[in-house]
Structure formats: structure tokens, C-alpha cells
């Protein structure tokens, strides 16, 4: 037990950043509600950082703050603010001004105009899959929209995997796995070593202490049955 009443430790958290490109409150509200409706398990009541670098002065920050929080999102900080008067307004509301890591600029490849062609008859639909073949480290969040997510390496504690479809982890799974993020109740989670902090399918979740002991650290398959999470051996 520590001899001091408090202890400060460095840590990292995975947060979504909402980049605002429009200052009209009603436009922002509708856009946010549309995004939340696409992935409610991922975004509903989520803590977010608001990036205002794309907004032109003047900005009605109290009104923007009211609109964003009315959608259920929880603002924990603001980034990208260069306007001195706006900084004062944000500070008055008790929100920290944050500095984000710089992103590498990516030059878009030239796009050749496509030649119209007849679609093939009886073509099978292609289901996209996002493949990650490197370790997923603490603090990282990987999202696979409208597809399955496959990770062929380890997932560290504090990392987060999110997919609108299924999630497959062929390594040690210590982080959080959220399948069916857009509400697909048929989604499943497959792990070769299940030691997750949290598993969730379409918003129905277990914390690590709810995972049955006989499946902890084992190869397992999770899915919904009668609106409840179930787990079985992965053979």
C-alpha cells in the first residue's frame, strides 16, 4: 500500500476527435446525430475532443458547446484553437485546450477517369475485411466500418478494436473488442486467447470479470443469443 494519499502516473486514453468544418449549430447537430446513429455502440455518450481549426472567426462557442453536448457526446477538451478570444471563452467553460500530435500529410494519388462497363452477370457481392498484421498497442483504436476486422497479432491492454461486422483476433486479446458497432446483432467475436478487458456485440457487453473462468485465456467464440452474450469453445 502506498504511503502517500495520491499518486500521479502517466497513462494514455483512446478518444475520438470531432473536426468541425461548419459553424452553423443546426448543421453540426444533424451531422453528429447521423454519425451516432451509424455506430451507436461506439459513439453514444462517447468522450470526445473538439477540433476547431477548420472554423473561421467569429465562433459562437457557447452555442456550439450546447449543440454538441445535446447529442449526448461528452466534450473533455478542445484542440486546434488559434484565436485568442475563443481560447478565453473555452477556458471560461472549464475545458482544457489540448495539442494534438501532428499528422503526416498524404498526397492523394491521381485518379484516372473510369471507363463505363457493363456489370458482370451473377457477380457475387464482395464483403470487405480490414486486416491488421502488426501488434495493436495500448492506446490505439482500430475501427473497421461496414466490414469485419481481423488481427493476426497480439492486442495489448488499453487497445480497442471496433468493427461493424465480426472481429477475429489470432493472438493474445487483452484489450477491448466491440463487434456489431452499428447494431448488427449477428456479429461475433473470435479469439484464440481471450483475456479481454471488455467484449461487446451490438452494445451488449461483458467486462473481464464477467467472462466465465473456463474460457478465460482460451480459444473462444462470442455471440448474442436471446439478447445476451454467450461464449463457447473455438474449435
From Swiss-Prot:
Membrane spanning residue stretches: none
Region forming the signal peptide: none
Disordered: annotated segments: 104-125
Cross-referenced InterPro entries: CAP/MinC_C, MinC, MinC_C_sf, MinC_N, Septum_form_inhib_MinC_C
Keyword Amino-acid biosynthesis: no
Pfam families tied to this protein: MinC_C (PF03775), MinC_N (PF05209)
Protein family per UniProt: Belongs to the MinC family.
Quaternary structure note: Interacts with MinD and FtsZ.
Protein role: Cell division inhibitor that blocks the formation of polar Z ring septums. Rapidly oscillates between the poles of the cell to destabilize FtsZ filaments that have formed before they mature into polar Z rings. Prevents FtsZ polymerization.
Protein name: Septum site-determining protein MinC
Organism name: Salmonella typhimurium (strain LT2 / SGSC1412 / ATCC 700720)
Amino acid at each position: 500500500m502506498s504511503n502517500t494519499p495520491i499518486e500521479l502516473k502517466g497513462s494514455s486514453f483512446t478518444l475520438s476527435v470531432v473536426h468541425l468544418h461548419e459553424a452553423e449549430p443546426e448543421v453540426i447537430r444533424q451531422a453528429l446525430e447521423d454519425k451516432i446513429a451509424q455506430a451507436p455502440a461506439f459513439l453514444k455518450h462517447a468522450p470526445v475532443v473538439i477540433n476547431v481549426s477548420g472554423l473561421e472567426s467569429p465562433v459562437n462557442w457557447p452555442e456550439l458547446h450546447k449543440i454538441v453536448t445535446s447529442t449526448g457526446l461528452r466534450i473533455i477538451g478542445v484542440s486546434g484553437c488559434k484565436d485568442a478570444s475563443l481560447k478565453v471563452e473555452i477556458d471560461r467553460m472549464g475545458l482544457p485546450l489540448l495539442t494534438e500530435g501532428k499528422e503526416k500529410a498524404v498526397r492523394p494519388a491521381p485518379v484516372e477517369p473510369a471507363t463505363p462497363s457493363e456489370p458482370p452477370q451473377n457477380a457475387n457481392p464482395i464483403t470487405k475485411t480490414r486486416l491488421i498484421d502488426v501488434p495493436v498497442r495500448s492506446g490505439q483504436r482500430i475501427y473497421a466500418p461496414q466490414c469485419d476486422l481481423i488481427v493476426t497479432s497480439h492486442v495489448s491492454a488499453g487497445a480497442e478494436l471496433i468493427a461493424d461486422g465480426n472481429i477475429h483476433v489470432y493472438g493474445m486479446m487483452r484489450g477491448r473488442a466491440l463487434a456489431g458497432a452499428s447494431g448488427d446483432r449477428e456479429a461475433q467475436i473470435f479469439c484464440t486467447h481471450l483475456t479481454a478487458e471488455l467484449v461487446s456485440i451490438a452494445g451488449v457487453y461483458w467486462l473481464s470479470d464477467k467472462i466465465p473462468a473456463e474460457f478465460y485465456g482460451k480459444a473462444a467464440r462470442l455471440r448474442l443469443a436471446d439478447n445476451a452474450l454467450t461464449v463457447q469453445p473455438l474449435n
